[in-house]
Swiss-Prot record:
Binds 2 iron ions per subunit. The keyword Transferase does not apply. GO terms for molecular function: metal ion binding; ribonucleoside-diphosphate reductase activity, thioredoxin disulfide as acceptor. It holds the Pfam family Ribonuc_red_sm. Gene3D superfamilies: Ribonucleotide Reductase, subunit A. Its EC number is 1.17.4.1. The active site is at residue 125. Provides the precursors necessary for DNA synthesis. Catalyzes the biosynthesis of deoxyribonucleotides from the corresponding ribonucleotides. GO terms for biological process: deoxyribonucleotide biosynthetic process. This is Ribonucleoside-diphosphate reductase subunit beta. It catalyses: a 2'-deoxyribonucleoside 5'-diphosphate + [thioredoxin]-disulfide + H2O = a ribonucleoside 5'-diphosphate + [thioredoxin]-dithiol. Keywords: Deoxyribonucleotide synthesis, Iron, Metal-binding, Oxidoreductase. The lineage of its organism: Bacteria, Bacillati, Bacillota, Bacilli, Bacillales.
Length: 345
């Protein structure tokens, strides 16, 4: 299959609107009133509307509360933060590499916003940890991914998929790398998100959970971007719209769900009150189905039709317009005058 060519800095012979997502022609001048995809500009506006920084969230209450968590809750908290930090670090790099081959300036611009948001997510984990634990513990948490065997297996599954594209950039490997991206942003975070939301509904670590919700909100838009690109590529490269691709998506999502369930059993299992292991595993399958539908593919678990963890919907519904479900003043946080709000300790 043809190799992908990186986007030119500019091309005076091409129109502003691109002729293709990959290996197309475009001037590379971005005019939002002259772009190929009608969904690109509304998505750009939504991504900008989500703008936030960790500094807006006061961590002083969480800092007081963290030592009162059970040992199991503290251990899960730290390991899940360590996982999220790894995933968002990798995601920042992958999105920038993928953007180099996008020959549509509007999609490249969206990818730039996405990459920036991933940097903010990653920094938010440092912000949380610096509020709660000593520097030495923080450093240890950021090394978990190197030494934890369960975590390594889970991470290597994603990285292997990304590296196939990086080492051999073709339309096929690019398309397949999107599936791994959707898994990373749209599946691998979700048992971890559920842990923090479960703490929040028990009035524990509310500020951290609010930050997680902001990240959740961003990731939903990131998944929307990548699934749209995936479906557009199947139109642009009909030779990739095959049974082989459908099988690849299904088997890859199922393998990812199995690894996610293994991680959940290892890190949470039946050790955290309020999280039912059977419900969580069904929930992971439910989310895998949701991502398959967004990719325009068949559900890998057709027998799973409903979300068994109905309580979590309030935490994931980031556009409901309801008052802050964490019972904080509002989601428009006043700026904290001292780092992490420690002037209030």
């Amino acid at each position: 299959m043809e190799q992908l060519q990186k986007r030119k800095i500019y091309d005076t012979t091409a129109s502003n609107a691109s002729t293709g997502i990959l290996n197309g022609k475009s001037s590379n001048v971005l005019n939002w009133d002259d772009v190929r995809f009608s969904w690109a500009y509304p998505l750009y506006k939504n991504m900008l509307a989500n703008f936030w920084t960790p500094f807006e969230i006061n961590m002083s209450h969480d800092a007081k509360q963290f030592p009162t968590l059970t040992e199991t809750e503290q251990e899960a908290f730290k390991k899940i933060i360590g996982l999220l930090a790894f995933l968002d670090s990798v995601q920042t790099d992958y999105s920038m590499r993928a953007a180099e081959y996008l020959t549509d300036s509007s999609l490249a611009a969206l990818m730039s916003v996405l990459s920036f948001q991933e940097v903010v997510h990653n920094q938010s984990y440092s912000y949380v940890l610096s509020s709660l634990v000593p520097k030495a513990t923080q450093d240890e948490i950021f090394e978990y991914w190197k030494h934890d065997d369960v975590l390594k297996e889970r991470n290597e599954f994603i990285i292997d998929g990304y590296e196939k594209f990086v080492d051999n950039p073709t339309p096929k490997t690019f398309l397949e790398s999107i599936v791994y991206d959707v898994i990373l942003e749209g599946l691998n975070f979700y048992s971890g998100f559920a842990f923090f939301y479960n703490l929040a509904r028990n009035q524990k670590m509310v500020s951290t959970s609010t930050m997680i919700n902001y990240i959740n909100r961003d990731e939903q838009l990131h998944v929307y971007l990548f699934t749209n690109i995936f479906k557009e590529l199947l139109v642009e490269f009909p030779e990739l719209n095959t049974e082989e691709t459908k099988t690849f998506v299904k088997t890859t999502l199922m393998k990812a769900a199995d690894l996610e369930k293994d991680w959940f059993r290892y890190i949470i299992g039946d050790k955290i009150p309020g999280i039912n292991p059977e419900d969580m595993e069904t929930y992971i399958s439910f989310i895998a189905n949701k991502r398959a539908v967004q990719l325009g593919m068949e559900k890998p678990y057709p027998e799973i039709k409903h979300n068994p963890m109905k309580w979590i919907r309030a935490y994931e519904d980031v556009n409901s317009g309801k008052s802050d479900f964490f019972e904080q003043k509002s989601r428009q946080y006043a700026k904290v005058s001292a780092d992490n709000g420690f002037d209030e300790l």
